[in-house]
């Protein structure tokens, strides 16, 4: 990897493919294209690889550094492409701790300890939750995760919010909150009245079913020893100096303007407003950073859609892309890391798994580390310190960031203590992942459409724009919003470019 210093001029590079973004999607696109015999340059704005996966450290009151995963971390059994890549890279994994009883806090603030997956709610609420989940899965079965906009009722399903639909289906607020948590705060990290039923069904379909999202032992199954960013670090190590860090792409020149669109009388230059050949064919691409000028025949835009506008496209994107990108936005979530002398909850026979629909902290899990990591963990050994990870989502995250630091910490730990008791209030280390403040992320976990946006504009998200191909978890079918989706999309982009090259050359891909 190369970290470029600031220079007065630009260094020129020439590659078959320029990849913008060195997260899992971009690195997989580059790795795939290179394996097919193409030359690549990966330009990354940050001074690290990994995108929304990020291994980090937090200093504790004991003066020691403790390992945390600032970004995405879990692997579920259906994420087969990520699983195979992790195995190929030789990265060990371990299962999330889940032995013991779980904790549920109901809308009245009463704490319940329970076994299994079903919340300890009133029988009526339990039946209502089962009925709603069955109804969602019935609709999910009709959805093609690769093209939800093709459903015969896509526009209808896309104009009603997930919350409104739940309230039409049920008059049980607790059931509604508990079902909503798995899509709203748990995945899209937006209030359930701000995204559509169709968007919720896409989330379900991408995981195989809504019941898979409900099953925390499925969706949050395993972790990578040393952190999920290790996947990107390993791929970047393979690519070597083809990866250049600290180089945000300022301008992407990608097409010749259509002279017929110029309007000299009104001072409008020629552009490509009416579209280009959306076939992903080679073109003349120039990516400009502060220090580099990369000439290529293809570009892979491997950043989340909310960051597309950070690049000045010359000429500007066609009108339909420009409009579509304005209907996609990031969610907002705070990932809470609290490190303790020991995993004290285990002493009390608790798993560390906690839920409370509609509460400040709606989910907590035992996130105790294992294996080698930045803090000096031993191979295959569990950290003696216990770590809890909790999540503060959407409007609650907004409220927390508005507070002074100590008030925010006290409020969050107080909310966690509702589940696990007063010892929760005394971590030796405390850290909040703030992806919304990251210039090259601007939110978490991923982007989703506003009401009506998916059915109108979703068909554009994976379609190449001239020589520009797209790759990120935000536009995935399988693995939507997950690292697995990023890997799949990166691989698909790399293969699509290689296949196009082979077709144009009259040769098979290998």
Where are these regions (language model features)?
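FAD-dinucleotide binding site
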Residues: 1-510
């Amino acid at each position: 990897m190369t970290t470029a210093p600031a220079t007065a001029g630009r260094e020129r590079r020439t590659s078959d493919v320029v990849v913008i973004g060195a997260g899992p999607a971009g690195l997989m696109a580059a790795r795939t294209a290179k394996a097919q015999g193409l030359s690549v340059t990966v330009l990354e704005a940050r001074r690290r690889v990994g995108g929304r996966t990020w291994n980090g450290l937090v200093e504790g009151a004991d003066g020691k550094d403790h390992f945390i995963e600032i970004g995405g971390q879990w692997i579920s059994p259906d994420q087969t492409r990520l699983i195979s890549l992790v195995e190929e890279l030789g990265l060990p994994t371990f299962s999330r701790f889940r032995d013991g009883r779980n904790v549920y806090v109901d809308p009245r603030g009463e704490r319940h300890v329970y076994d299994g997956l079903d919340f300890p709610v009133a029988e009526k609420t339990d039946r209502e939750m089962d009925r709603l989940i069955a109804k969602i899965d019935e609709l999910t079965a009709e959805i093609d995760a690769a093209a939800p906009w093709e459903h015969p009722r896509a526009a209808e399903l896309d104009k009603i919010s997930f919350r409104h639909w739940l309230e039409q289906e049920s008059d049980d607020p607790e059931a509604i909150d508990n079902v909503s948590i798995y899509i709203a705060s748990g995945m899209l990290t937006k209030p359930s009245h701000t995204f559509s039923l169709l968007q919720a069904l896409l989330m379900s379909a991408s995981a195989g079913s809504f019941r898979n999202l409900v099953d925390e032992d499925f969706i949050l199954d395993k972790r990578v020893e040393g952190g999920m960013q290790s996947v990107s670090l390993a791929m970047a190590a393979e690519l070597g100096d083809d990866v250049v860090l600290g180089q945000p792409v300022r301008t992407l020149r990608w097409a010749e303007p259509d002279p017929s669109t110029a309007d000299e009388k009104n001072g409008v230059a020629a552009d490509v407003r009416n579209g280009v050949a959306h076939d992903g064919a080679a073109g003349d691409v120039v990516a400009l950073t502060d220090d580099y000028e990369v000439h290529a025949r293809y570009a892979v835009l491997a950043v989340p859609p909310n960051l597309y506008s950070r690049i000045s496209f010359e000429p500007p994107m066609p009108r339909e892309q420009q409009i579509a990108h304005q209907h996609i936005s990031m969610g907002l979530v705070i990932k809470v890391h609290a490190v303790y002398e020991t995993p004290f909850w285990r002493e009390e026979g608790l798993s560390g798994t906690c839920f409370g629909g509609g509460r400040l902290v709606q989910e907590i899990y035992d996130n105790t580390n294992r294996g080698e990591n930045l803090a000096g963990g031993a191979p295959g050994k569990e950290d003696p310190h216990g770590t809890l990870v909790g999540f503060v989502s959407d409007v609650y995250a907004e409220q927390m960031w508005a507070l002074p630091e100590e008030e925010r910490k006290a409020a969050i730990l107080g909310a966690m203590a509702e589940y696990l008791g007063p010892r929760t209030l005394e971590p030796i280390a405390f850290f909040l992942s703030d992806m919304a403040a990251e210039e090259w992320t601007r939110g978490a976990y991923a982007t989703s459409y506003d009401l009506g946006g998916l059915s109108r504009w979703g068909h554009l998200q994976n379609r190449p724009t001239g020589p520009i191909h797209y790759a990120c978890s935000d536009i995935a079918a399988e693995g939507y919003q997950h690292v697995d989706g990023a890997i799949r999309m990166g691989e698909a982009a790399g293969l699509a470019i290689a296949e196009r090259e082979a077709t144009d050359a009259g040769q098979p891909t290998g």
